[in-house]
Amino acid sequence: MAGNPDVVTVLLGGDVMLGRGVDQILPHPGKPQLRERYMRDATGYVRLAERVNGRIPLPVDWRWPWGEALAVLENTATDVCLINLETTITADGEFADRKPVCYRMHPDNVPALTALRPHVCALANNHILDFGYQGLTDTVAALAGAGIQSVGAGADLLAARRSALVTVGHERRVIVGSVAAESSGVPESWAARRDRPGVWLIRDPAQRDVADDVAAQVLADKRPGDIAIVSMHWGSNWGYATAPGDVAFAHRLIDAGIDMVHGHSSHHPRPIEIYRGKPILYGCGDVVDDYEGIGGHESFRSELRLLYLTVTDPASGNLISLQMLPLRVSRMRLQRASQTDTEWLRNTIERISRRFGIRVVTRPDNLLEVVPAANLTSKE
């Protein structure tokens, strides 16, 4: 749904993991065999989810994983949708060597992804080579066949570093580059080279020249009125802390001209910062996965999810508004979060982002809105 021509609206989601257990509930499940220590069959994750929240009506339709989120998004004026696709799309390939947890979705289940209508999928992450170069090749081809641009991984380093360009209206574009850091669990052997497929991998974000290189690559084709985004897979699965080197890296990207940093890797949301008028999402958390019923880390409430909606002034690249849609997963399906869960998310995001001067308020429509504390004070 096209938005206001005077602004650029981007929908951002974190990790979308449509493989493994989620793939098994879709109309065309792939091979369920796994090589995990505690689970040898992907249908086991379906049983875990059902044990917690009730029976899943197999097979589900394509819209099922997105659930109630779609009704909200279909009434939202969005120009571009960007997610981190953390699964391969393949029925082929070999399990990655010495990697116990591997994700794949059958190519015939791609309509479950296109139900969200993403424009760009970031692929620089620690699962895109779960089924080797063949799995990566199949994923890129499946996305292209569905009309979705992919960034951050490809046939060689040149392809992995190539940005996606999405035209907004007649003149403006959103430019997206996708990068992974070793801190997210991407092995050095997955790094793309001039003569080898792989991901755009950076070793140490704290090095100033690394941020300069990423920014220069993404900004190479930027014109006045364009919005430039770096989608960054970094950090551990759990925890709210932001590494000083990651903060410095994000700041340097924005100092160089990047308009938005889209962070992901953690299974729950991490802090938000508005730096020089530009948003930094240090971790968007999971959107779709098969983790229901898996114990541990309960204090992070990973069953609660957020989708992020940014509105940007293309003339300056500055953020106009940042809203979040609170969701809860049940039976591998997203539903609107309750008022209690929404308040928990509001309080948590505000608390962990306090060092960056962020306040979070609940809107009358039960969306959350990020407000820099200085702006909030000036209105009171």
Curated annotation (Swiss-Prot):
Keywords: Stress response
Disruption phenotype: Disruption mutant shows reduced PLG content in the cell wall, increased sensitivity to chemical and mechanical agents, reduction of biofilm formation and attenuated virulence.
Domain of life of the source: Bacteria
Keyword Hydrolase recorded: no
Signal sequence segment: none
Swiss-Prot/TrEMBL induction comment: A member of the dormancy regulon. Induced in response to reduced oxygen tension (hypoxia), low levels of nitric oxide (NO), carbon monoxide (CO) and carbon dioxide (CO(2)). Expression peaks in the late log phase of growth.
Pfam families from the UniProt entry: PGA_cap
Keyword DNA-binding carried by entry: no
Family membership: Belongs to the CapA family.
Known function: Could be involved in the biosynthesis, transport or localization of poly-alpha-L-glutamine (PLG), a cell wall component. Contributes to stress tolerance and virulence.
Name the record gives this protein: Probable polyglutamine synthesis accessory protein Rv0574c
